[in-house]
A protein has these predicted regions:
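Short glycine/proline- and aromatic-enriched beta-strand/turn motifs that initiate or cap beta-hairpins
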Residues: 21-75, 208-210
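Transmembrane beta-strands of outer-membrane beta-barrel proteins
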Residues: 31-39, 85-87, 121-127, 179-181
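Residues that define the transmembrane beta-barrel architecture of outer-membrane proteins
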Residues: 28-30, 62-68, 99-105, 118, ...
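Gram-negative (and chloroplast) outer-membrane scaffold detector with strong preference
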Residues: 74-146, 158, 168-170, 202-210
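Extracellular loop and loop/strand-boundary signature of outer-membrane beta-barrel proteins
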Residues: 52-58, 92-97, 146-152, 185-191
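Outer-envelope beta-barrel architecture signal
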Residues: 24-32, 78-80, 116-122, 156, ...
Length: 210
């Protein structure tokens, strides 16, 4: 894993540890909801070849993904939230309609500060997922004919994802949520894995004790 990513994750863990040391961890309730997302993702370059090993072209995954997912959290004390989240990001690129799909989920821990209606938060997710990549070299026709020059790849990975965001309390029970993340793959390195910032928007529903 890149050194700068290690520094970012270490910084987030330090914030979590510092906040935990400041107060109690009494259970306060829970929250959860759904979000849509987009962003900008890009992979390293990789070579495509025939079954015989002949070079075809060099390509890379790059573009604007769209996806959906959600999260659920248990609230402890004034700041700590622990739970889980999961998302699917789909990306189409190239004139042939090549598709890349990243499914990802894990254990979530973050810290939130209640500043009136604004609730900024920072945290990290640790988990894993799967990458599915269907590479087309010809524009597919709308028929039932099997296409030539198709590559299908699927693999799993482990990852960390630092997150930062803010919630706006529309009411005691519903918040408008915006956040940003960056999935950092820490196992099974692959040239076609797309990385980059993703931006999320959605609603979280709350049930907290006063």
């Amino acid at each position: 894993m890149n050194k700068k990513y290690v520094i970012v994750v270490f910084f987030l863990i330090s914030i979590l540890s510092s906040v935990l040391a400041q107060g109690g961890l009494k259970y306060r309730g829970f929250s959860g909801g759904m979000m849509i997302h987009t962003g900008y993702l890009k992979s390293n370059s990789f070579d495509l070849q025939t079954i015989q090993g002949n070079y075809i072209t060099t390509s890379n995954v790059e573009g604007i993904p769209f996806g959906i997912g959600g999260s659920a959290r248990l609230h402890f004390g004034k700041h700590l939230r622990v739970g889980g989240e999961g998302y699917v990001s789909n990306l189409r690129y190239g004139i042939q309609g090549t598709t890349a799909s990243v499914s990802w989920g894990g254990v979530l821990a973050d810290c939130v500060w209640e500043l009136g209606r604004l609730w900024p938060f920072v945290g990290v997710v640790a988990g894993g997922g799967a990458m599915e990549h269907i590479i087309l070299q010809d524009v597919p026709a709308d028929d039932f004919v099997v296409e030539n020059n198709v590559s299908y790849r699927e693999y799993t990975f482990m990852a960390l994802s630092p997150i930062v965001g803010v919630e706006y309390a529309l009411s005691e029970k519903m918040h408008l949520t915006f956040k940003m993340d960056y999935v950092i793959k820490i196992s099974n390195p692959q040239a076609d894995f797309p990385s980059g910032p993703r931006f999320f928007l959605g609603f979280m529903f709350y049930r907290l004790d006063d």
